[in-house]
C-alpha cells in the first residue's frame, strides 16, 4: 500500500509517499521560514498563500522522486488539524480533490498523532506501551500511549508551549525567527551556573507545565545584566537548562506514575541535542529506553502524515467527500485503531 501524505498545518509544506512494504519512497519539504522572518512569527494569510503555490508542485516532485505515477498511489492522507485553519484547508482541499480524481481513499490525520508516530519511521521503532513527550511550538504534552488511538493525557502546558518559550526568549536575546535552534546553538557557548532560572511547577505534584514565566525571568535577567555576547550566551544556557530540567523531571514522574519503561519524544523541540542527551542518560539509569525521530522528522513533515494515514486507513479511517478541518482538536478524541 502506497500512501501520499500532505502536511500544511503551519509554515512547512511537506509531501511524502510511504509504502507499507518498502518504507519511505519520497520526501519533499518546503519551509516558509524566510517568508515569515521579517515579521518575527508566522503570518497565517501568507502561510496559506504559500501552501497554495507549493503543494501541487511538491506532490509532482514526490511522485517523480519515488519513480511512480498517480495510478500507483493507493490513498491520500492529509493533516486535518490542529493548526492554522487556512493552511489546513489548502492541504485538505488538495488531498480530497486528488483522492476523488484518483478514486482512492482520503484519510484525515491528526497532526500531533503524526508527530507521535514519527519515531515509528526509524529502524528501531518503539513498542507499546510508552510515555510520549510531545514538545513543539504549539504543544507540550505528556501522554500515556497503549496503542494506536489509545491516548491518555497525563499533563500539558497551561500557557506557553516549550517551543514557543524558546522562540520568545530567543527574540529577547536578539535572535532571528525561528529562534529556538539559534538559542540552543548560543547556549552551547554559555557558562553553566552563572545564572539560575526557576524550574516551573516542579515544586508541586502533577504533570502539567508552565513556561511563560521563564520568558519574563529571561527578560528581567537581560535587563539587569546587559547584552554583551557572553552574557547573552550565559542567559541562553540558563534558560535551556531550565526547560530541559523541567521536561526531564516531568517525564520521570510520568514514567513512575505509569510504570512504563519506554519514553518517546516527538515534535520540533525533540531535535534539541541537550534534551536528547539528558533524557537518554535518565532512561539508561532507569533501565529503560528513549525513542525519537531523526531531526528532519521532528519538525513538520509529510512522512509522518503518510505513515499515520496508512495506519489509520488500515483501521478503516477513510473520510467522506466533505472537506473538514479542525484548528483545535484534542488528541484524546481520536478513536482507537
Swiss-Prot record:
Binding sites annotated in the UniProt record for substrate: 134-138, 167, 180, 272
Keyword Cytoplasm: yes
Main location: cytoplasm
SUPFAM superfamilies xrefs: Actin-like ATPase domain
GO biological process, alphabetically ordered: tRNA threonylcarbamoyladenosine modification
Positions of Fe cation binding: 111, 115, 300
Recorded coiled-coil stretches: none
Cited InterPro entries: ATPase_NBD, Gcp-like_dom, KAE1/TsaD, Peptidase_M22_CS, TsaD
Molecular function in Gene Ontology: iron ion binding; N(6)-L-threonylcarbamoyladenine synthase activity
Keywords attached to this entry: Acyltransferase, Cytoplasm, Iron, Metal-binding, Transferase, tRNA processing
Catalytic activity: L-threonylcarbamoyladenylate + adenosine(37) in tRNA = N(6)-L-threonylcarbamoyladenosine(37) in tRNA + AMP + H(+)
PANTHER family: TRNA N6-ADENOSINE THREONYLCARBAMOYLTRANSFERASE, TRNA N6-ADENOSINE THREONYLCARBAMOYLTRANSFERASE, MITOCHONDRIAL
Function statement: Required for the formation of a threonylcarbamoyl group on adenosine at position 37 (t(6)A37) in tRNAs that read codons beginning with adenine. Is involved in the transfer of the threonylcarbamoyl moiety of threonylcarbamoyl-AMP (TC-AMP) to the N6 group of A37, together with TsaE and TsaB. TsaD likely plays a direct catalytic role in this reaction.
NCBIfam families on file: gcp_kae1, T6A_TsaD_YgjD
Similarity comment: Belongs to the KAE1 / TsaD family.
Protein name: tRNA N6-adenosine threonylcarbamoyltransferase
